[in-house]
Design a protein with these regions (language model features):
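N-terminal helicase ATP-binding lobe
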Residues: 1-209
Length: 209
């Protein structure tokens, strides 16, 4: 219903798996390209968020181009959520400021001092909030789509890393194309998943092989 079409077998299986998980954990969805893994992941994420109290999602992709391509679909999904609560969205990669759809949203940016009660802001309930535009606060927005390195950096010992952990701790984390990552990236992914496990964060891994 959220996407305007009935779920196929893969999407139905993902939703059933999300509904039957006893506790936050890792849901692995392996299927060939073109079967609707993205919609399956978002539908499962919505179920997991409702069941385990998450307040948003992080969608990690391997490249800036794939993140840009998926951004309009994620925005549409976010805008079709059933309640009218205001939410923030963030495109998190180094060239985000060149994305036309993201630039359009920035023209409707919510100032830091705004309490979201401005009638003029009610038409667009998913917005780019000014406070989340900084690189350190990027993962604190409700809906974050970006390159997977935004997640991998949570495995590093670096300044302000606790803000990444804080942003991820309240979300459902989706990692796409995980079959394409090399051994070097997988070491950081393993460590990041270990942290997410301690935080009881539901994780969805998407793979084509």
């Amino acid at each position: 219903k959220r996407f305007g079409f009935a779920p196929n077998a893969v999407q139905q299986a993902a939703m059933e798996a999300a509904n039957t998980m006893d506790a936050p954990g890792i849901l692995i969805l392996e299927a060939q390209m073109g079967v609707g893994k993205t919609e399956a992941a978002l539908a499962a994420a919505e179920i997991l968020a409702a069941r385990f109290g998450a307040g948003g999602i992080f969608f990690g992709l391997p490249t800036q181009a794939t993140a840009n391509g998926l951004f309009p679909r994620l925005l549409q999904w976010a805008e079709n959520q059933p309640d009218d609560l205001p939410r923030s969205i963030r495109l998190a990669h180094g060239m985000a400021e060149l994305n036309e759809e993201y630039i359009r949203l920035q023209h409707q940016v919510v100032p830091v001092e705004d309490d979201w009660d401005d009638p003029e802001a009610e038409e667009q309930r998913v917005q780019v909030h000014q406070w989340f535009r900084g690189s350190k606060q990027a993962l604190l927005a409700n809906f974050v789509i970006g390159t997977v390195d935004q997640l991998l950096m949570a495995a590093l010992c670096q300044k302000h890393v606790m803000l990444r952990h804080l942003g991820l701790a309240g979300k459902v984390v989706i990692v796409d194309e995980c079959h394409a990552y090399d051994a070097y990236m997988n070491r950081y992914l393993d460590r990041a998943l270990e942290w997410l496990g301690w935080y009881r964060v539901p994780v969805i891994l998407l793979s084509a092989t």
